[in-house]
Structure formats: structure tokens, C-alpha cells
Regions:
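N-terminal beta1-alpha1 cap of cysteine-dependent amidohydrolase-like domains
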Residues: 1-119, 130, 137, 142-175, ...
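Conserved G/P- and acidic residue-centered "switch" motifs that form tight phosphate/ATP-binding loops
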Residues: 122
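The feature captures the ABC ATPase H-loop/switch
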Residues: 125
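Active-site-proximal beta-strand elements of phosphoester/diester hydrolases
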Residues: 222-225
Length: 262
């Protein structure tokens, strides 16, 4: 079976929290795992960002996960810290999670070094861009005139907009004949300046916010701003989530089969 690692979200130590007081919690949102599991994929959350433990240092590094797993999904979640891309937070609540940034960039680099596929979802797409030297809009609503409502807490994953797939792009090859699609939208940050060797493969309409990016380097790295794992099953009004999943897993299987052939 294909083995895919999923980056963790963090609840950092909080003395005010009633349960697990003073503890750091790491978790994944189950829809991500279920999305992968529909293709009989073994999913693993990747813990311990730097190998250190409360008991003693471990020799397990991020590269060890990249060696053993066949691909990586960078999950959505908290904001990317503006300091990670050389800025200061415009508002305190947009400080993001610098610890998670460094952990996920380390994971991305480890999997890219082994030429194993990486798929970034929402925040994950933003992490890919920042890791490659790009920048983000800290808040679309205040920084981009005429921006759509890209996040609505009241309706969450039911918030949608039209998205244009760039003609001739790798993404367009997965959706032949589909130039304008409907995607969900649950973010207030977004790609501003593209990172090194990244190309935009989809835009929101009509505000032209980057919705998908792909690395043109030697391994598979794709980031989508929407959440394919939240797509309503069987609802054909939305972009079909399966071509992206199958393309990612195809590249993971190529590396797995090559390893078995050695």
C-alpha cells in the first residue's frame, strides 16, 4: 500500500486550557485522512517537529519520514507567520504559527530532496510558496481592493467562488474542457509574490487571487488554495476532487515501485 504522511496541526502549551494543561497537542483533521483512505492509502500524521522528545533526543528526523513514506500532504490550518516571509504581522491575531512553519518547511525540503511528491492544501499551498521564497497577502479583505469574501466563518466550507484553471497548465490537463470551476474557500491569506520556479495554475474570479501553484523543479509539488477533502461527494457543481488525488498518488506510486525495483 502507498504510505502518505500528513503534517500536523498544533495546539501549543496553554496554561489556561482546562484539559492537557501545559501540553502540546498535535492532530490532523479527519477529512484529510479519509480523503486519502478512499484510495486504500495508509495515512500517517508526522509528529515531533525536530526529533526532540520530553525524555531524550531521538534519532528520528524529518528526513527519516521522507525516506520511509511515499508522499506528503501539507494540511490546512493556522496562518503562516509573516516573519517567515520577512514581514511583520499587521495585526497581532495574524502572527500565525512560526513553529509549524519551520516544521512544515523542513518536511517539504526533506521530501523534495528525495524527489517524493508533495501536495499542499490551503495553508499548505502558502507554505510551499513561502518555502520557495515567495510572499503572502496577510489579509485579502484589507490588502486587496475588490477581493471576494474568501473566508466566512458562518458557512465555513460552504463558502465558494468561481476559479479559472490556467489553459495549458498541468492542472488543466487533469480537467480537460473545464476552464471555469467552483471551489470552496476558507482562507484570508493567499499567495502574493510567487516563489522560485513556481507557476500559478488557477485564479479566483473575478479578483484574480492565486488558487493553485506548481513547482517546475524536478519533483512533484502542487499547492491548491481550496480544500479538495471538503468537496461534497457526488456534487457535480464543484470541481471534482479525484483527479488531483489520483495524480498525486500516481506520482507517489512511481517512487514506491522504483524503490521495490532496487
Amino acid at each position: 500500500m502507498i504510505k502518505i504522511g500528513i503534517s500536523a496541526s498544533f495546539f501549543h502549551e496553554d496554561p489556561k486550557r482546562a484539559i492537557f494543561k501545559g501540553m502540546t497537542l498535535q492532530y490532523i483533521e479527519q477529512n484529510v485522512a479519509h480523503w486519502l483512505m478512499q484510495r486504500d492509502v495508509l495515512s500517517f500524521m508526522i509528529p515531533s517537529p525536530d526529533g526532540r522528545t520530553r525524555r531524550e533526543d531521538s534519532r528520528i528526523t524529518l528526513d527519516a519520514y521522507a525516506q520511509e513514506l511515499d508522499g506528503l500532504v501539507l494540511m490546512g490550518g493556522s496562518d503562516v507567520c509573516p516573519e517567515t516571509y520577512g514581514e511583520k504581522a499587521i495585526r497581532p491575531e495574524w502572527n500565525g504559527d512560526r513553529v509549524r512553519d519551520e516544521y512544515e518547511i523542513g518536511l517539504l525540503n526533506a521530501f523534495v530532496a528525495r524527489r517524493k511528491p508533495v501536495l499542499g492544501v490551503c495553508r499548505g499551498a502558502q507554505v510551499i510558496n513561502v518555502a520557495m521564497g515567495g510572499t503572502l497577502w496577510q489579509d485579502l479583505g484589507t490588502q486587496v481592493p475588490g477581493a471576494l469574501t474568501h473566508r466566512n466563518w458562518e458557512i465555513y466550507e460552504k463558502n465558494t467562488h468561481a476559479t479559472t484553471i490556467v489553459p495549458g497548465s498541468s492542472l488543466a490537463k487533469l480537467y480537460p474542457g473545464a476552464s471555469l470551476v467552483k471551489t470552496n474557500s476558507i482562507h484570508h491569506q493567499a499567495v502574493k509574490d510567487l516563489g522560485r520556479n513556481l507557476v500559478a495554475e488557477a485564479w479566483s474570479e473575478p479578483d484574480r487571487v492565486v488558487e493553485a501553484i506548481r513547482w517546475t523543479g524536478p519533483s512533484y509539488v502542487l499547492g491548491v488554495q481550496w480544500h479538495p477533502e471538503f468537496q461534497p461527494a457526488g456534487d457535480r457543481s464543484f470541481i471534482d476532487d479525484r483527479p488531483i488525488l489520483d495524480d498525486f498518488l500516481h506520482h507517489a506510486s512511481l517512487h514506491k515501485n522504483a524503490a521495490y525495483a532496487l
